[in-house]
Design a protein with these regions (language model features):
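Amphipathic alpha-helical binding modules
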Residues: 63-104
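Short terminal alpha-helical segments
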Residues: 1-34, 91-103
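Amphipathic alpha-helical interaction modules
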Residues: 16-69
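Solvent-exposed, amphipathic alpha-helical segments
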Residues: 1-8, 50-53, 77
Length: 104
């Protein structure tokens, strides 16, 4: 359940391992909640992107905390969209895509 995954992520230290775990948990949850699979996928990809960007590098506490705050905001928006009409879910998916995957 997304609220559990988000709460666990929030309670962890803001290091890259927390992002890796969050991503894996979201990807795993896709199978258990197919009606919301796209939300879990985008959250997982977003967390994985942070992990991939900083894996093997020193990360300042400020950068890690900023990333964690952004991830929590997106996860909470996705939580709010669960059980809502498809248009609400699509809005959250678009928000995640625009904030995290824009190029150029």
């Amino acid at each position: 359940m997304l609220s559990d995954i988000t709460s666990e992520f929030e309670s962890r230290k803001p290091g890259i391992a927390s992002f890796e775990t969050f991503a894996a948990e979201c990807m795993s949850e896709m199978n258990g909640d197919p009606a919301n699979a796209s939300l879990y996928l985008m959250l997982g990809l977003t967390a994985r992107q942070f992990y991939d960007q900083f894996n093997g590098q020193p990360v300042t506490v400020a950068v890690a905390e900023e990333g964690k705050d952004r991830m929590l905001a997106v996860a909470r928006a996705a939580e709010a969209a669960l059980g809502e009409p498809a248009d609400d879910k699509l809005s959250v998916l678009n928000e995640i895509a625009l904030k995290n995957f824009q190029t150029g």
